[in-house]
Swiss-Prot record:
The active site is at R145, K169, H237, R240, H263, Y272. PROSITE patterns: CB, TYR_RECOMBINASE. It is found in: Cytoplasm. Residues 2-85 form the Core-binding (CB) domain. SUPFAM superfamilies: DNA breaking-rejoining enzymes. GO terms for biological process: cell division; chromosome segregation; DNA transposition. CDD domains: INT_XerDC_C. Forms a cyclic heterotetrameric complex composed of two molecules of XerC and two molecules of XerD. This is Tyrosine recombinase XerC. One of its GO terms (molecular function) is DNA binding.
Length: 296
């Protein structure tokens, strides 16, 4: 398969257009395949065996790649092999049964409600402070991903219906309720935004009027965590985790939390049940007469 590079181009277009994967996922897949191509000596997929690819995975593992990274490598190889098989370029997919080491489950870290309230108690000193408060209120109110919030346009927010339209992973749309506190914060920000020379329809813009980048949003949140005196770092996903945990603690409705978070698989949401159990265990230890140690 002499024109393997051109098939990689076609594959990335297929991922972006037909599979509608995010640009970041497409870039990650491309990187994994280009790295594999280099390590395998740019051999044709028609010549590769499962043993070749297993050897590649073992080599990457010895180089210290994490289980998460190896899982991405295996996924990219499987998907590319399946694509070539479908296009009739190979007779069998050598990556079909490829596996990576199991990832250890790490519980997402979240803020307790008091810490969230402290973080969001931002004095309305200027327009940027109002904007940042609105951003963090919306993160916590809706459990949005960073990419979802950054992509929001003004038209996506229906203040009358108290809803926001979000485009999530795989270009899937979901309509989410927005809490009254977040709506009020966004309303204060929009008064400032309407007086700015905005260059596009983005809901959240910089002082120059351009859409806020992912990195800018992260940096502002880190700054506010320091200003507000929080002892831990704060990033968008931490507020998303906090939203999920607090919702589950209050409602116990795993399916509803799954829908709100935009998880395609309930198993992804179930990690929060471990956090919820930790909360219940603390309550039990503090309240049940038989749970307390003698002398407490």
């Amino acid at each position: 398969m002499a024109d393997q590079a051109s098939w990689l181009e076609r594959f990335t277009r297929y991922l972006a257009t037909e599979r509608q994967l995010s640009p970041m996922t497409v870039r990650n897949y491309r990187f994994e395949l280009e790295r594999a191509d280099t390590l395998l000596g740019q051999r044709s997929w028609q010549q590769l065996s499962r043993q070749d690819l297993s050897g590649l995975m073992a080599r990457l593992h010895r180089q210290g790649l994490s289980p998460r990274s190896l899982s991405l490598t295996a996924s990219a190889l499987k998907q590319f092999g399946q694509f070539l098989l479908k296009e009739g370029l190979i007779d069998t997919n050598p990556a079909a049964t490829l596996s990576a080491p199991k990832q250890s489950k790490t519980l997402p870290k979240n803020l307790d409600p008091d810490s969230v309230n402290h973080l969001l108690d931002i004095p309305p000193e200027d327009g940027l402070a109002l904007r940042d408060k609105a951003i963090m209120e919306l993160f916590y109110s809706c459990g949005l991903r960073l990419a979802e919030l950054a992509a929001l346009d003004v038209k996506d927010l229906d203040r009358e219906s108290r809803e926001v339209r979000v485009i999530g992973k795989g270009s899937k749309e979901r309509i989410l309720p927005v809490g009254s506190v977040a709506l009020a914060a966004i309303g204060d920000w929009l008064k400032v935004r309407n007086q700015m020379p905005c260059q596009d329809d983005a809901l959240f813009v910089s002082s120059r009027g351009s859409r806020l980048s992912h990195r800018s949003i992260q940096a502002r949140m880190e700054k506010w965590a320091q200003i507000q005196g929080l002892s831990v770092g704060v990033h968008p996903h931490k507020l998303r985790h906090s939203f999920a945990t607090h919702m589950l603690e209050s409602s116990g409705d795993l399916r509803a939390v799954q829908e709100l978070l935009g998880h395609a698989n309930l198993a992804t949401t179930q990690i929060y049940t471990s956090l919820d159990f930790q909360h219940l265990a603390k309550v039990y230890d503090g309240a049940h007469p038989r749970a307390r140690k003698k002398g407490d």
